From Swiss-Prot:
Species of origin: Buchnera aphidicola subsp. Acyrthosiphon pisum (strain APS)
Binding positions for substrate per the UniProt entry: 9, 68, 177-179, 199-200
Free-text function comment from the UniProt entry: Catalyzes the reversible epimerization of D-ribulose 5-phosphate to D-xylulose 5-phosphate.
Catalytic reaction(s) noted: D-ribulose 5-phosphate = D-xylulose 5-phosphate
Record bears the keyword Magnesium: no
Gene3D superfamilies referenced in this protein's UniProt entry, alphabetically: Aldolase class I (3.20.20.70)
Cofactor info, note text: Binds 1 divalent metal cation per subunit.
Protein name: Ribulose-phosphate 3-epimerase
Keyword Isomerase belongs to the record: yes
Pathway given in the UniProt record: Carbohydrate degradation
Binding site for a divalent metal cation: 34, 36, 68, 177
A Pfam cross-reference name: Ribul_P_3_epim
Any one biological process term the GO annotation gives: pentose catabolic process
């Protein structure tokens, strides 16, 4: 594993200048956009729907977009977000009665499929559907709000999922979301993550390019540690 992907979280962007801000962070060296969708039911917060995603595509945002559905139920929204321009659609196992059917629905609508795990969600769901996944998302905070601290218990979970992925010779992406900062991203990478959702840890800075250069250096260091 020698490629790392930065995924700025749209929740921390400037909503008054959303398209402009997202374009700036992509041009500064980000790889994809993390698009959080919350329903004030599955999680205690409310965010945006497919119209916002479609508007970003119309603004000529061409980078991959990972739509993270923190909603319940989930299936009726999948075709809408796929049509609006999602690249990945990621959902939580608690949000559907039939995980495999929901994964199939995502694929049928032309998107890559991800499964998200809250800090307290067990990993045994992976025993049944690993081969259908393109991405596994581990929440390193309890979902619903930004600017939370990274939960240290996530490290063991990351190592466990990395072993599962590698044991199956899989190229599934392993994403972590919550409290990812300059001072911990190298340790998170060494634990097995290769996609890093960054909210306030990136958007709070005025010079995105400079911060991303610093992040890349941290990740280069993590990669050098992992191969020795």
């Amino acid at each position: 594993m020698n490629k790392f992907f930065l995924a700025p979280s749209i929740l921390s962007a400037d909503f008054a200048r959303l398209g402009e801000d997202i374009k700036k962070v992509i041009d500064a060296g980000s790889d994809l956009i993390h698009f959080d969708v919350m329903d004030n039911h599955y999680v205690p917060n409310l965010s945006m729907g497919p119209m916002i995603l479609e508007s970003l595509r119309n603004y000529n945002i061409t980078a991959p977009i990972d739509v993270h559905l923190m909603v319940k139920p989930v299936d009726n929204l999948i075709p809408q977000f796929a049509k609006a321009g999602a690249t990945f659609i990621t959902f939580h196992p608690e949000a559907t009665l039939h995980i495999e059917r929901t994964l199939n629905l995502i694929k049928e609508n032309g998107c890559k499929a991800g499964l998200a795990f809250n800090p307290a969600t067990p990993l045994n769901f992976l025993d049944y559907i690993l081969e259908k996944l393109d991405l596994i998302l581990l929440m390193s905070v309890n979902p619903g709000f930004g600017n939370q601290s990274f939960l240290p218990s996530t490290f063991n979970k990351l190592r466990e999922v990395r072993k599962i992925i590698d044991a199956n010779f899989s190229d599934i992406l392993l994403e972590v979301d919550g409290g990812v900062k300059l001072d911990n991203i190298a340790d998170i990478a060494c634990a097995g993550a290769n996609v890093f959702v960054m909210g306030s840890g990136l958007f709070k800075y005025s010079n995105y390019k400079l911060v991303i250069e610093k992040i890349r250096k941290k990740l280069e260091y993590a990669h050098s540690r992992s191969i020795h």
